[in-house]
């Protein structure tokens, strides 16, 4: 199984679109998780071309406020989808591998860039992780550190929640 998590910072640039389509074919990707897509909806033609024509199932989380949206897709030749859950800061797919029946979770996150929302983001993530018993792949743009100058104060503010969630 191969996949990619990418903060694409918008999909309006044809070079980014072509890069992702080519990458999907070249690396034979089974999932694609994008943040900051800048899109509230996507046509079927757009999505089919984005994954290089493969048979993908997609979920679009539209932009809201400063959050610029998410897009999560899986290859239906590789996986069966059980359920899709959308939180304020995540999209979760419950997946079953077609080849061996193994069940697991694929979670794409896009954390709040504003410090005032960090607590909400980490709390939601902690609740998500605590309630699940299946193995999980969790990735995306956590926005925990936004530059070298803020590193010391931001980690101090959030490290308790973040690191307790991981343990």
Please place each PLM-identified region on the residue numbering.
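A shared catalytic/ligand-binding motif for oxyanion handling
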Residues: 1-167
